[in-house]
């Protein structure tokens, strides 16, 4: 798949890829509105589903331990989608002129890192503590900053390809590690009657920001230099993550009733 994507990205404009992704997410979200499970058992299934989703959202907002997961996951999806998913293909194929074959190898490193991270997590599970992975998420922000800086240095084919391979590998590794940490934390620390709604609410909030991010990034690539996008997204992720961390520390210092 990465190799095929590398060939297609050199033929099809990035904006078209963004449009396809936006359409797919909107169709998926629209289709989920009509999913019905055992609807015959209740006369107001839709109302109950809406109330459960609203209750889970309020629970996440009010729970100081899980609030960082709500804001952090949405922030990750928004920044990574623009700074990596859209900007990196454009930088590699258009700005730097790297071949589609090399782009396929670079993208393959992303998948390779994801697979190895998943295998590593099965052998070495993360600690079962109620704590948001600030370091891992912040590392994604710094990687986006590095991507923007590498795109600005004098181009050298071998160095650039190796650098992007390493960075994409780390992105794949961190993305899976963060996702596993989030799901594991919810499964362990959220009560049974809320667990499904909490996972669904986090997913809905995070994924709803992806089309917006794709639209903004797809528009920005024609307005600014491509390296600017990961620099902005990386800075935004690091700064806002720091704000979330400060609010988290402040909330934990407040007396509880």
Predicted regions and their residues:
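Transmembrane alpha-helix boundary/hinge residues in polytopic small-molecule transporters
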Residues: 3, 69, 86-87, 177-181
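Juxtamembrane intracellular "pre-TM" segments in multi-pass secondary transporters
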Residues: 37-72
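A single, central transmembrane helix in multi-pass transporters
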Residues: 11-19, 58-118
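Hydrophobic alpha-helical transmembrane segments of multipass integral membrane proteins
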Residues: 4-9, 18-23, 27, 170
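C-terminal transmembrane bundle of multi-pass solute transporters/carriers
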Residues: 26, 54, 61, 93-257
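Helix-loop junctions on the cytosolic side of multi-pass membrane transporters
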Residues: 18-48, 246-257
């Amino acid at each position: 798949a990465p190799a095929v994507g590398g060939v297609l990205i050199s033929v099809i404009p990035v904006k078209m890829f963004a449009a396809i992704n936006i359409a797919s997410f909107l169709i998926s979200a629209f289709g989920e509105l009509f999913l019905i499970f055992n609807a015959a058992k209740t006369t107001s299934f839709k109302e109950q589903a809406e109330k459960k989703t609203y209750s889970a959202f309020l629970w996440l907002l009010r729970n100081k331990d899980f609030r960082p997961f709500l804001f952090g996951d949405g922030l990750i999806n928004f920044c990574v989608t623009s700074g990596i998913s859209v900007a990196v293909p454009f930088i590699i194929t258009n700005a730097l002129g790297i071949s589609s074959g090399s782009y396929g190898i670079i993208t393959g490193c992303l998948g390779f890192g994801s697979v190895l991270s998943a295998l590593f997590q099965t052998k070495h599970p993360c600690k079962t503590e109620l704590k948001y992975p600030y370091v891992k998420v912040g590392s994604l922000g710094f990687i986006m900053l590095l991507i923007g800086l590498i795109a600005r240095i004098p181009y050298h084919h071998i160095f650039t390809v190796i650098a992007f391979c390493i960075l994409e590998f780390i992105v794949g590794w961190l993305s899976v590690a963060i996702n596993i940490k989030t799901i594991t934390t919810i499964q362990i620390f959220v009560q049974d009657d809320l667990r499904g709604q909490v996972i669904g609410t986090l997913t809905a909030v995070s994924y709803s920001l992806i089309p917006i991010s794709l639209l903004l990034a797809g528009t920005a690539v024609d307005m600014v230099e491509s390296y600017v996008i990961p620099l902005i997204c990386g800075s935004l992720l690091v700064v806002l993550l720091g704000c979330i961390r400060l609010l988290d520390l402040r909330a934990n210092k407040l007396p509880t009733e």
